[in-house]
């Protein structure tokens, strides 16, 4: 991953991880017959969404994709950051990056999200997997909002201050999202509950903080057809233009 000092090359490692996943997923409970019904590569959902995000960024520019799922919240960013922050950076970052938060989900890990909200004195009842009543939907939205905002906060880097013999020095650590002018939401929670775009709006910077979040002017849209993960897999079998057309229509970009 580090061929030389300050040179970060994660693409080969990512390919090896995908190969290992494809080899071992067929040994997981309930997945032993997947090879009988799939005649192509088996991609993990986060990997497929990252492929889709990379291809779309090539068309529309720097972006963030937030995928709030039942078990995890995955945040993908395709950006080199802003020149201003790059001048302060003290560590290399890849052009495309994904973080997977295993404690932020709206189904498998929902109880833990409820516990974290309670610690912040924001009590909420655990909603059912498919909320139907107004109270259940509001509870699910609270969990989704917390997962999305917390996931992006964890994904983003921040400014820090070091004290040196020559005085205080400001540096940038971690991922710089300040050049991302597009935030896209995917996953069942954001795309099927009402108010997904409004939740994404709260992942943006409100100004004045040291966290390197997407700017307040970033456009927030949804993968309305919930197809980004599928499209990531489709790039291996169909022309890029055709798959990108599906993605752009779904997100309205």
Language model: regions and residue ranges:
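A glycine- and small-aliphatic-rich helix-loop capping segment at beta-alpha/alpha-beta transitions
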Residues: 79-91, 200-207
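Gly/Thr-rich phosphate-binding beta-strand-loop-beta motif of the actin/hexokinase/Hsp70
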Residues: 56-82
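Glycine-rich phosphate-binding loop plus the immediately following alpha-helix
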Residues: 42, 88-149, 216-222, 231-232, ...
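Flexible loop/turn segments at secondary-structure boundaries
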Residues: 71-75, 82-84, 113-114, 191-193
């Amino acid at each position: 991953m580090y061929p030389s000092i300050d040179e970060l090359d994660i693409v080969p490692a990512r390919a090896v991880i995908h190969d290992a996943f494809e080899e071992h997923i067929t040994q997981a409970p309930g997945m032993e017959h997947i090879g009988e019904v799939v005649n192509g590569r088996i991609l993990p959902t986060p990997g497929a969404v990252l492929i889709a995000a990379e291809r779309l960024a090539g068309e529309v520019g720097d972006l963030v994709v937030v995928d709030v799922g039942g078990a995890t919240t995955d945040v993908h960013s395709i950006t080199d950051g802003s020149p201003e922050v790059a001048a302060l950076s003290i560590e290399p970052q890849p052009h495309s990056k994904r973080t997977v938060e295993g404690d932020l989900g709206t189904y498998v890990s929902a109880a833990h999200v409820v516990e974290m909200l309670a610690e912040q004195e924001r009590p909420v009842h655990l909603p059912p997997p498919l909320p139907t009543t107004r109270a259940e939907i509001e509870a699910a939205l609270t969990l989704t909002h917390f997962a999305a905002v917390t996931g992006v906060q964890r994904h983003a880097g921040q400014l820090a201050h070091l004290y040196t013999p020559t005085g205080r020095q400001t540096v940038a650590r971690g991922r710089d999202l300040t050049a991302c002018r597009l935030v896209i939401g995917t996953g069942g929670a954001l795309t099927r509950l009402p108010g997904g775009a409004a939740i994404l709006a709260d992942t943006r910077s409100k100004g004045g903080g040291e966290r390197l979040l997407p700017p307040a002017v970033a456009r927030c849209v949804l993968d309305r057809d919930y197809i980004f993960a599928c499209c990531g897999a489709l790039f291996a079998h169909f022309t890029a233009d055709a798959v990108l057309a599906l993605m752009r229509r779904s997100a309205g970009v």
